[in-house]
From Swiss-Prot:
This is O-acetyltransferase epaC. Belongs to the trichothecene 3-O-acetyltransferase family. It comes from Aspergillus niger (strain ATCC MYA-4892 / CBS 513.88 / FGSC A1513). InterPro entries: CAT-like_dom_sf, Sec_Metabolite_Acyltrans, Tri101-like_N. The keyword Transferase applies. It holds the Pfam family TRI-like_N. O-acetyltransferase; part of the gene cluster that mediates the biosynthesis of nigerpyrone and its derivatives carbonarone A and pestalamide A. The biosynthesis pathway begins with the polyketide assembly by epaA to form phenylacetyl triketide precursor from successive condensation of two malonyl-CoA, presumably with one phenylacetyl-CoA starter unit produced by the phenylacetyl-CoA ligase epaB. For the nigerpyrone biosynthesis, the reactive polyketide chain is released as an aldehyde through the R-domain. A nonenzymatic cyclization and dehydration may create nigerpyrone. GO terms for molecular function: acyltransferase activity. Transmembrane segments: none annotated. Keywords: Acyltransferase, Transferase.
Amino acid sequence: MATNGFRPEYEDLGRYEDILGQLPMLQVYSHIMLPFAMPEGLSRDTIIADLEAAVRQIRAHVPWMAGKVVNVGKGPDNSGRYIVVPCPPPDPLIVVRDVTHAFPPYKEIQRLKAPNSMLDSRLLAPTNAFPQRFEDSEEDPFRVIRLQASFVDGGVFLDFVTQHNMTDAGGLFGFARLVAMAMRGEQFSESLLEQVNRDRRNIIPLLTPDEPMLDHSHHIRPPITDAQPVVRPDPARWHFLRFTAAKLAELKDLASQTMTPDPEVPYITTDDAVSAFCWKKYITVRHRRRNTPDARSRFSRAMDGRKVLGIPAEYMGDLVHNVTTWLTFRELVDLPLGEIARHMRRELNRANTAYHVRSFATFIAQEPDKSTIAYGGRFNPDTDVGSSSVLRVDLFPVFGKLGRPDFIRRPNFPGIPFPSLLYFFPQNPQGDCDSLTCLTDADMEALNQDSEWTSMVEYIG
């Protein structure tokens, strides 16, 4: 019998092995960091106690989050299976650091809007991050969740970390929301636990023999190894940008006004418009250096498959598939913003379907060596852009006595750049969207000298 919504079958860790989480490229950690101002009169000890209580509540109700990930059955031409197994709890449950000596007062961090250059992962993060692979060991297990609280004068940074074979961005944000709920003193409802602990084994119906598989060959790349990572770390740096609510609306209006009528594209979204703007400007500044008008550029968008499969947002497993749009450098330079956004929305409308997700899952399931599969395939950071947007996700909940975070950030991992990657983070309560992008110095300098770019984008750093 269930107690407080918890069911005994949730303790069967075999139910959490899915298909989309089996890619070796996901043998990494994902991070999302939330900075808070310390409320008057609230002690560090109280915050630590509340965070530890929240993690205990999660571990008790979400068994797979209390485990670690291991790879079994790996061999020649076979990448093995990623499964979650029991693991003793860490002691202490969360990492706590006083980093006051290395940071200005939190009010100054607020004033500067928490630029990436300030967010040293060596101080603020408990472990490494994508695209750097993590290897499980007795000394440092590949835990499904980690949490670090880093205190500065007048503030605290909370770094939420999840194992990527077990969760996508929705699952990472779900972990943060569970902590917020627990810190508010809320119990996890039966319906929430049902989705968080949902059996993943058959959540995506694979194609039947009489259903043709779509072409996913663009996801094939050389096998991912330590010597051959997801992308070569060319000289590049991470930067935070801000699109204010007013500029987001302006970009959407501009794109809507310059779009040719298309029966396949009844509308475009703010996400389409801001993605098209970044793609156009990135390639425009590269074209000035390269002068290769016929070169093809690819914009790869990570899409959440939950909606098209009828799966609630609270489900935390990997359900990401990718939608790709191709245009030439000449087209990206010459076409108006609305036409680029129309192309992107058309490809998304065609591919963001249950059949596409089922086909992608079948493609993965049938390939013994999944190290040859990557979202970006043979990604070329000089011509392509890889993007993930969670612009519409709410990630500013109240974390009990701590209140709401001021920003959404990611610790800065300067030694592991991923050039031409672009994240759009959730909009803040004022409607502003902060974006994290990795670009070469040449790209960033050229963009900051582009008047159209600087009129739309606030550079945070």
